[in-house]
Curated annotation (Swiss-Prot):
GO terms for cellular component: extracellular region. It comes from Aspergillus awamori. SMART domains: Alpha-L-AF_C (SM00813). This is Probable alpha-L-arabinofuranosidase A. PANTHER family: ALPHA-L-ARABINOFURANOSIDASE 1.
C-alpha cells in the first residue's frame, strides 16, 4: 500500500518573476549520459461524444436520427419527397431497441418519385468515394427503390443507385445499395430515398434504421471517417481513453453509458440521451472503440461507471451493497472484452464478430469523482470496484478518476494510478509548470484532460501555455505516464465546449487544425525514451525546455511564453545536424478557425558547430529541435 497526499504548484509570485525576465541569450547544455526513463505512451487521446464528435463527427454514419431512437422520438433531419407525407409510427417497431419507424403515406394519385430525405448532421460530406446505404422496409411494394445524394440548393446529383425490391406488410426486409459518387464542393447535400409513386399510390410503407456510409478508415465496417482518423494518425498518439468523460456518467444510473447496449447490430442498439444535449445513437460502441484502437495502434483505456452520475443525478452516488449490480456489470464487461470463448460473455463477443479477446491493460474507475458531490464517497466506491476487478484481473492497471487526496483512500493500492485534470487560463497552466517536479514517484499519474479554457478557438498564447505545461510533465514522464488534451473534436455547427483541438464542418475537406493541434503533433511525433539533464545559465521563464533521447537521436522541446525573441545556443555533444520545427506568431491572440488558418509550423534544417546549435526563438513560440 502506498501513502498519498496532496501537493501544491508553484506560487503566483514565482510565476510573476518568471514572466518579467528580459530577453537575452540562453545557453542549454544537454547531457548525453544517464537520465530518467520516459513513458512510451505519454501522448494520446481522450474521447467522448461532445460537440457531435462521434455522431456527426468521426463515426462514419452520415444520417442523423437514423432509427428514431429515444423516449420521445421525432423526425429531426427527415422530410418527405413528392406527393407523400411521413410520420412516426410506434405501432410498427423494427426491433425492441428500435420501437419506432418512419411511415410513408403515398397519395392515391401519386406519380413520380415519392419518399424521404435526410439532411445529415448539418450536411453530408460526399468525398467522391464509393458510398453504401442500407434500410429496412415493410409494406406491400414491388418495384424500384432509388437512393440519391443531391445538392440541397442546386439539385446536382453526386451519386445514385436503383434496385428492384419486393416487400410485404407482414415483416421488415432489409435492402442495401452501393454506388460511386463525385465529390461535392460543400456539405449542402441531402440523402434521398424514393420509390415509384405510381406503384405505391394509395399505400403506406414503413422504413426503419437507415444508414449511409462513405469510405471508412482502413475500410472498417461501421467504421471511422478517414479524413478525421487520418488527422489523428498524423499525431502518432499512443492511447485512447473512452467513452468519457461526462458522457460515461450520464445524468442517472439508468442514463449511464451501458456497454451491452452499444454492441451487436445497429438496430439492436437503443441509443441513449447523451450528457451533452443530444441523443447518442451508440453506433460508435464498444467494438468500434476497440477497432479504433486497433486501426490506429492505440492502447485502450476503458472508463467504467462507478455509481456516480453528473452532479449526483438520479440519487447517486450509490454506495454499500447497492453497488453490487454495477460492479457485476463491469465484471461482465471485462469478461466480454478479455474472456475466451468458453466464457459466457467471451462467447457473446465471438458471436458478435470478434473471436479473439482484445488487449485491454488499463481501466479507469469513474470520471471526475472529485466534482458534483462524488468526492466524499469515492474512496469507498473506488475500493469496492478495485477489489472486485483486481481479484478477477490482477494484471489490469486500475486508475482512480481523481488525484485529489481528500477523495481517495488513505493508502492507494500498490500499482494503481491517479487521474489529474486541469482546465485553466494560460497563466494558470504556466503556473503548473513545476507541479509535477514535486509528485510522489510511487503513484503514477494520468493527466486525463487538460487545455487552456474559456475561449472560442485555441490561440497562440494558450497553445504556448499548454506547451509549457507539457514540458513540465514530460520532464517528469517517469511518473506521469499518459496525458491527453480535451476535448478532441468539434463540429462547428453544434458546439457545447470550446476550445477544441480539431474542428470541422460537413464539407468534404473542411477540417481545421488549431494551434494547439500543432503543439500536440510536434510533441507527440518527437519523443525519446529517456529524459536528459539540461544545464543552463538561465532560469525557466519565459523560456521553458525539456530534452530527451532515443538511441542517437535527441529532441529538445522549447516554449517561449513571452513577447520578446529568445536567442539560444543548444549544445548536444556528438550531434551535427538537426531539424527545427517552429510554431509562432507575434500576436498572442492569433488563431486558426473555420474561416482562417493563420498559424502553421515551419521546418528548417540546422547545422551544429562542434555539437552546438545556434538559433533564435520568436515571441509566443513553440519549437522542437530534433538532432542526431
Amino acid at each position: 500500500m502506498v501513502a498519498f497526499s496532496a501537493l501544491s504548484g508553484v506560487s503566483a509570485l514565482s510565476l510573476l518573476l518568471c514572466l518579467v525576465q528580459h530577453a537575452h541569450g540562453v545557453s542549454l547544455k544537454v547531457s548525453t549520459q544517464g537520465g530518467n526513463s520516459s513513458s512510451p505512451i505519454l501522448y494520446g487521446f481522450m474521447f467522448e461524444d461532445i460537440n457531435h464528435s462521434g455522431d456527426g463527427g468521426i463515426y462514419g454514419q452520415l444520417l442523423q436520427n437514423p432509427g428514431l431512437q429515444g423516449t420521445t422520438p421525432n423526425l429531426t433531419a427527415w422530410a418527405a419527397v413528392g406527393d407523400a407525407t411521413i410520420a412516426i409510427d410506434g405501432d410498427s417497431p423494427l426491433t425492441s431497441a428500435i420501437p419506432s419507424t418512419i411511415k410513408l403515406d403515398v397519395a392515391d394519385d401519386a406519380t413520380g418519385a415519392v419518399g424521404l430525405t435526410n439532411e445529415g448532421y448539418w450536411g453530408i460530406p460526399v468525398d467522391g468515394s464509393e458510398f453504401q446505404s442500407s434500410f429496412w422496409i415493410k409494406g406491400d411494394y414491388s418495384g424500384d427503390i432509388t437512393v440519391r445524394l443531391v445538392g440541397n440548393y442546386t439539385g446536382t446529383e453526386y451519386g445514385s443507385a436503383t434496385i428492384t425490391h419486393t416487400s410485404t406488410a407482414d415483416n421488415f426486409t432489409q435492402a442495401s445499395v452501393k454506388f460511386p459518387t463525385t465529390k461535392a464542393p460543400d456539405g449542402n447535400v441531402l440523402y434521398e430515398l424514393t420509390v415509384d409513386g405510381s406503384v405505391a399510390a394509395g399505400s403506406s410503407l414503413n422504413f426503419g434504421y437507415l444508414t449511409l456510409f462513405g469510405e471508412t478508415y482502413k475500410s472498417r465496417e461501421n467504421g471511422l471517417k478517414p479524413q478525421l482518423a487520418n488527422v489523428l494518425a498524423d499525431m502518432k498518439g499512443s492511447f485512447l481513453r473512452f467513452p468519457g468523460g461526462n458522457n460515461l456518467e450520464g445524468n442517472s444510473a439508468e442514463n449511464r453509458w451501458k456497454w451491452n447496449e452499444t454492441i451487436g447490430d445497429l438496430w439492436d442498439r437503443p441509443g441513449r440521451e447523451g450528457t451533452w444535449t443530444y441523443y447518442n445513437t451508440d453506433g460508435l460502441g464498444l467494438h468500434e472503440y476497440f477497432y479504433w484502437c486497433e486501426d490506429l495502434g492505440l492502447v485502450p483505456v476503458l472508463g467504467v461507471w462507478d455509481g456516480f452520475a453528473l452532479e449526483s443525478g438520479g440519487n447517486t452516488p450509490i454506495t454499500g451493497d447497492a453497488l453490487t449490480p454495477y460492479i457485476d456489470d463491469v465484471l461482465n464487461e471485462l469478461e466480454y472484452i478479455l474472456g475466451d470463448t468458453s466464457t459466457t460473455y467471451g462467447a457473446w463477443r465471438a458471436a458478435n464478430g470478434q473471436e479473439e479477446p482484445w488487449n485491454l491493460t488499463m481501466v479507469e474507475i469513474g470520471n471526475e469523482d472529485m466534482l458534483g458531490g462524488g468526492c466524499e464517497s469515492y474512496a469507498e466506491r473506488f475500493t469496492a470496484f478495485y477489489d472486485a476487478i483486481h481479484a478477477a484481473y490482477p494484471d489490469l492497471i486500475l486508475i482512480a478518476s481523481t488525484s485529489e487526496a481528500d477523495c481517495l483512500p488513505e493508502s492507494m493500492p500498490e500499482g494503481s494510478w491517479v487521474d489529474y485534470h486541469d482546465y485553466s487560463t494560460p497563466d494558470g497552466l504556466v503556473g503548473q509548470f513545476n507541479y509535477f517536479d514535486n509528485l510522489y514517484r510511487s503513484v503514477p499519474y494520468f493527466i486525463g484532460e487538460y487545455s487552456r479554457w474559456e475561449i472560442d478557438w485555441p490561440n497562440m498564447k494558450g497553445s504556448v501555455s499548454e506547451a509549457v505545461f507539457m514540458i513540465g510533465f514530460e520532464r517528469n514522464s517517469d511518473v506521469v505516464k499518459m496525458a491527453a488534451y480535451a476535448p478532441l473534436l468539434q463540429l462547428v455547427n453544434s458546439t457545447q465546449w470550446t476550445p477544441d483541438l480539431i474542428g470541422y464542418t460537413q464539407s468534404p475537406d473542411d477540417i481545421f487544425l488549431s494551434t494547439s493541434y500543432y503543439v500536440q503533433e510536434m510533441f507527440s511525433r518527437n519523443r525519446g525514451d529517456t529524459i536528459k539533464e539540461v544545464t543552463s545559465d538561465s532560469d525557466f521563464g519565459p523560456l521553458y525546455w525539456v530534452a530527451s533521447s532515443a538511441g542517437d537521436s535527441y529532441y529538445v522541446k522549447l516554449a517561449n511564453y513571452g513577447s520578446e525573441t529568445q536567442d539560444l545556443t543548444v549544445s548536444i555533444p556528438g550531434t551535427s545536424t538537426g531539424k527545427l520545427t517552429v510554431l509562432a506568431d507575434n500576436d498572442p491572440d492569433a488563431y486558426n478557425s473555420d474561416t482562417q488558418t493563420l498559424v502553421t509550423p515551419s521546418e528548417s534544417t540546422v547545422q551544429a558547430s562542434n555539437g552546438t546549435f545556434t538559433f533564435s526563438l520568436p515571441a509566443w513560440a513553440v519549437a522542437v529541435l530534433a538532432a542526431n
